Amino acid sequence: MILNFIFNVFFLFIIFFTILHKNEEKKSIKLKGKTMGTYWQVKIPYVPNQLHIKNLIQRKLDEDEKLLSSWKKNSLVSKFNKLKKNQLLAIDKKFFKIISIALKINKKTYGKLDITIGNLINIWGFGNQKKPHNYPSINKIKQVMALTGMKHLSLISNANKHYIKKNIDGMKINLSTLGEGFAADHLSSVLKKEGIENYTISIGGTVLVKIKNKENSKIIAIQKPTDKIQSIHLLIHLKNKSISTAGTYRNYYYLKGKKISHLIDPKTGMPVTHNLISVSVISSTALEADGWDSALLILGFKKAKILALRENLAVCLITKKNNTFSTWISPCFKKFLINT
């Protein structure tokens, strides 16, 4: 979900993999911009009205950001965060879908994907609060954790109308682990309505590939998980699928000499510290790939491996010990792998 850049073309310095191009059409265009604190890039066949397409893409992404942002005061997320317990907030189908996927993955990952940890994200300096100069106290963490938990969040549907509510005051949600995937799927539907059938969408650490031609595919390079010299770790081919990568080695800071990752374990209230540093997930939708990667990374290697096998997930896990990388690839991921 973070740090993705296009190899030899345009580097997005906050992602984990690079897109290479196989059977690249000579007449193609690349549109790019900013959204959700990261970069987006869309590659499509040449169209004469490319300015219209670019403006349309940016407008739709701006709409998504207004929907999902924790920073914008009038976003649905911000409106929910201001609710008192048991108050209903009317939501649209798009918001209903993203919350439904979050609830689904939460149940399958022992609660590791938890969108109700907005307060935890804030006290660790990855939300709308500044990075702390001291570790949050145990009492502070316990106090904030009392305001988390997907069990305190409810979706309600009635006569084609959707609502969301919380059953405790002070709970805040944060959808940063799902926003890029959601936006990529949204752009896919937008391009389809414009009659565009072949495209590659990159938003942060998420890539979505659609190809009508039966033979062609895109080659994706999963980057070696290091914040130093960028190099290719694995190559895969992708067609009509999405891949999302989460990692601990880019979005972090040091506090009293210790590395603080942006990935917070909702069960402990603490940033993850284990040696699983990168997780890539391939799925039919970008939203699900984006949700699974962070949850699996928070789980740690052993539990993530067991879960990937149990759920038949296409997963690549990379661990690091003493500056040595080790890679585990699930059986479902192997069919995408390019042997080099």
Curated annotation (Swiss-Prot):
GO terms for molecular function: metal ion binding; transferase activity. It is a lipid-anchor. Its EC number is 2.7.1.180. The keyword Cytoplasm does not apply. Its main location: membrane. InterPro entries: ApbE, ApbE-like_sf. One of its GO terms (cellular component) is plasma membrane. Gene3D superfamilies: ApbE-like domains (3.10.520.10). Residues 1-22 form the signal peptide. Mg(2+) binds at T177, D290, D293, S294. It is an enzyme of class 2 (transferase). It is found in: Cell inner membrane. FAD binds at M36, W71, K112, L113, D114, N174, E180, I264. It catalyses: L-threonyl-[protein] + FAD = FMN-L-threonyl-[protein] + AMP + H(+). SUPFAM superfamilies: ApbE-like. Its cofactor is Mg(2+). Keywords: Cell inner membrane, Cell membrane, FAD, Flavoprotein, Lipoprotein, Magnesium, Membrane, Metal-binding, Signal, Transferase. Belongs to the ApbE family. Flavin transferase that catalyzes the transfer of the FMN moiety of FAD and its covalent binding to the hydroxyl group of a threonine residue in a target flavoprotein such as NqrB and NqrC, two subunits of the NQR complex. This is FAD:protein FMN transferase.
